[in-house]
């Protein structure tokens, strides 16, 4: 007989202490960089997912998924006897959080399992979808990540219901904690409608991608809950555009996704649904949205509050969605869940859909305001009419757009695993040419570094060019970086932050060295401009260290190639243009976010730790590598020499700092004894003396005798940034 042991009620007390951030809400957050510094994976640092994945029998996994999808479970019955539509929604909502503005979100990491995503209203009841998958995840263990399984389940569901997909690639490693770096919006409550999410011009603020907090894209009822299709079309275009989807891809995705399944609103969600998973009682074991309406499942399911199917065959791929949308007229009404939805005015569609659970019942198709938007907006309608006339084109476009959706955050194809990945090179993957020559060795590297240092280029110019090339990398979606030398192409060559006139001079000099070297070779050894840009930065760092009395060699791995304009989507790369780069003391004039916050954001995208960020800023300042050669933060009488002068000044008490203006973006430093102005600084510079944690790190490098440690740590951090995109070396 089981014995019940009474435990204290969780409502009586809590041993969970307040965080420092709770006491000091304006404190600069470094926890997003701490995530880069620690390994939360319980399998340890030696775990190699790619190696484990190679042992996976993918066909066996898909067979298991097929059996699961067609085996309805009593605890959560499948609509129409098939879990395919539920799995498609799960995969879509996992990948659909991706936004191009900062590359964050997306399916990698499988973070739909964690707060806040697991408790978003738009993800209601997806906890059941993941719980259905647990036996498969349990079976394959470390060979198959949650991140891959979630997407694979949705991809195979499409094939199970009749459409051949474009392919699928594995390689998404699991995270074991939420990504604290993602800014989901300013709201304090889910689905709040407020202007703070938008600029004065009505545009979504960067880096946001969703129109409403807690929704993947837009409000299905229409903006602010108003059934206005044309206004909805504007929101759709903006939100999907932030995900790098054009009108054709957007229309294909919505039409294809809504070809399957139904929405659930048997009654009002607010009156019937319990707490979200993160707030639900412990005995619910991680499941949320407990439904007290009827049976709480099957025909009584409540998710969004909108109720009904789109087509007459909800688990078959066909043109039913497009035909219903375009061939019939629709009018708005409040459904049984109290939400706006659209019903056909033509009685011919009434009761034409089998009920999802009761074969004796029939339902009438419905549409969302976001569906009607595809009919009312002239540009979307043009695409939809073309798809209606050419069903095969519709299928191909959906398959390709779906593939892009679920792989957009994975980076280049070198990271893709498995036999189902297509061979086709797609421009949104930022392709670079294969290496078609022998690579330079140590002798050639030394020769080229000498050639570079014998030019008129300065340490600052070489360092800034290499940094500008490599620091476009975003670990969020594995885009950017030095490989490809796209800094010489549009749009990067004309970005303000890259100082186009100076950049042109540096690149011309390096291209001349490249041409002379390659033409002089009698063998197949060649050097790319991409490699030469990095090598120039390395040579400058070595020279700066030597001038400070330290003999160092910056590691260098050749093998980068030079991308062509045809391999470069100019509009796509505009998303990589930094709002600010605190490492160069640069910020756009229109930026209203504190510079130190943007520094941490940039450091996170570069996968840096607080220590690496600190040593890079201090080192770059000593090298004089600032935007437009500004004296902001260059606290040294010997710019171009790798010293710890920056830290000595920022930590010392000889200088008193005063803001230049009310905005407190720029500061002047005055000698406390003489009153003479000695230095100028940005917020990025002063944060290393102001912030307690950063000051503690800075003190390591600012101490007497610490310069050698600074040089070594700077070289390590510099090398890390230079090779962040070298997936070919992994």
Curated annotation (Swiss-Prot):
It catalyses: H2O2 + AH2 = A + 2 H2O; 2 H2O2 = O2 + 2 H2O. Formation of the three residue Trp-Tyr-Met cross-link is important for the catalase, but not the peroxidase activity of the enzyme. GO terms for cellular component: cytosol. There is a cross-link at residues 217-243 (Tryptophyl-tyrosyl-methioninium (Tyr-Met) (with W-92)). InterPro entries: Catalase_peroxidase, Haem_peroxidase, Haem_peroxidase_sf, Peroxidases_AS, Peroxidases_heam-ligand_BS. The active site is at residue 93. It comes from the Archaea. SUPFAM superfamilies: Heme-dependent peroxidases. Binds 1 heme b (iron(II)-protoporphyrin IX) group per dimer. The keyword Oxidoreductase applies. The record marks 89 as: Transition state stabilizer. Its EC number is 1.11.1.21. Belongs to the peroxidase family. Peroxidase/catalase subfamily. Homodimer or homotetramer. This is Catalase-peroxidase 1. It comes from Haloarcula marismortui (strain ATCC 43049 / DSM 3752 / JCM 8966 / VKM B-1809) (Halobacterium marismortui).
């Amino acid at each position: 007989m089981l014995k019940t042991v009474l435990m204290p009620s969780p409502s009586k007390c809590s041993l969970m202490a307040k965080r420092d951030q709770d006491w000091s809400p304006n404190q600069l957050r470094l926890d997003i960089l701490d995530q880069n510094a620690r390994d939360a994976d319980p399998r340890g640092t030696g775990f190699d997912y790619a190696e484990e994945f190679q042992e996976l029998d993918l066909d066996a996994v898909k067979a298991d998924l097929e059996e699961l999808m067609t085996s309805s479970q009593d605890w959560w019955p499948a609509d129409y006897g098939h879990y395919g539509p539920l799995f498609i929604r799960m995969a879509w909502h996992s990948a659909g959080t991706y936004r191009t503005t900062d590359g964050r979100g997306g399916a990698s990491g499988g973070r739909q399992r964690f707060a806040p995503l697991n408790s978003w209203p738009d993800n209601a009841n997806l906890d059941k979808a993941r719980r259905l998958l647990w036996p498969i995840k349990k079976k394959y263990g470390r060979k198959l990540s949650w991140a891959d399984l979630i997407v694979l389940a949705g991809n195979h569901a499409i094939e199970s219901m009749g459409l051949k997909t474009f392919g699928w690639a594995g390689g998404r490693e699991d995270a074991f904690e939420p990504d604290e770096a993602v800014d989901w919006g300013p709201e304090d409550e889910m689905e709040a409608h407020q202007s703070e999410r938008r600029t004065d011009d009505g545009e979504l603020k960067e880096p946001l991608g969703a129109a409403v907090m807690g929704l993947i894209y837009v409000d299905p009822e229409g903006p602010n809950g108003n059934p206005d299709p044309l206004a909805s079309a504007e929101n759709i275009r903006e939100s999907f555009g932030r995900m790098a989807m054009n009108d054709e891809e957007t229309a294909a995705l919505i039409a294809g996704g809504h070809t399957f399944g139904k929405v659930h609103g048997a009654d009002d969600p607010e009156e019937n649904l319990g707490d979200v998973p993160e707030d639900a009682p412990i005995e619910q074991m991680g499941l949320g949205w407990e439904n007290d309406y009827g049976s709480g499942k099957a025909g009584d399911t409540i998710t969004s509050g909108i109720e009904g199917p789109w087509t007459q065959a909800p688990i078959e791929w066909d043109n039913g969605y497009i035909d219903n949308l375009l061939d019939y007229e629709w009018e708005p009404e409040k459904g049984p869940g109290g939400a706006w939805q659209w019903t056909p005015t033509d009685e011919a569609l009434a009761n034409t859909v089998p009920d999802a659970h009761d074969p004796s019942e029939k339902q009438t198709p419905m549409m969302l305001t976001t569906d009607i938007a595809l009919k009312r907006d002239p540009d979307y309608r043009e695409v939809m009419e073309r798809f209606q006339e050419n069903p095969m084109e519709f299928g191909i476009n959906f398959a390709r757009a779906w593939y892009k959706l679920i792989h957009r955050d994975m980076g280049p194809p070198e990271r893709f695993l498995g036999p189902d990945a297509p061979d086709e090179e797609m421009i949104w993957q930022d392709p670079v040419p294969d290496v078609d020559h022998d690579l330079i060795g140590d002798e050639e590297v030394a020769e080229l570094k000498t050639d570079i240092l014998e030019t008129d280029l300065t340490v600052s110019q070489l360092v800034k060019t290499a940094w500008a090339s490599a620091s476009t990398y975003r670990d969020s979606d594995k885009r950017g970086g030095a490989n490809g030398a796209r800094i010489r192409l549009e749009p990067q060559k004309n970005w303000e932050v890259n100082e186009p006139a100076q950049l042109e001079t540096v690149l011309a000099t390096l291209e001349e060295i490249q041409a002379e070297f390659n033409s002089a070779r009698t063998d197949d050894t060649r050097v790319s401009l991409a490699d030469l840009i990095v090598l120039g930065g390395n040579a400058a760092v070595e020279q700066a260290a030597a001038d400070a009395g330290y003999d160092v060699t910056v590691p260098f791995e050749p093998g980068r190639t030079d991308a062509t304009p045809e391999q470069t989507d100019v509009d796509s790369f505009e998303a990589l243009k930094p709002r600010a780069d605190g490492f160069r003391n640069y910020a756009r004039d229109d930026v209203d976010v504190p510079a130190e916050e943007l520094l941490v954001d940039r450091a996170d995208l570069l996968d840096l730790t607080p220590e690496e960020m600190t040593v890079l800023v201090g080192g770059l300042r000593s090298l004089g590598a600032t935007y437009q050669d500004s004296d902001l933060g260059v606290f040294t009488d010997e710019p171009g020499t790798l010293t710890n002068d920056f830290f000595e000044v920022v930590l010392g008490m000889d200088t008193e700092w005063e803001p230049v203006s009310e905005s407190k973006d720029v500061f002047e430093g005055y000698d406390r004894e003489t009153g003479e102005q000695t230095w100028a600084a940005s917020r990025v510079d002063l944060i290393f003396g102001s912030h307690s944690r950063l000051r503690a790190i800075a003190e390591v490098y600012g101490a007497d005798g610490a310069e050698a440690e600074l040089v070594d740590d700077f070289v390590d951090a510099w090398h890390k940034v230079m090779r962040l995109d070298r997936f070919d070396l992994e």
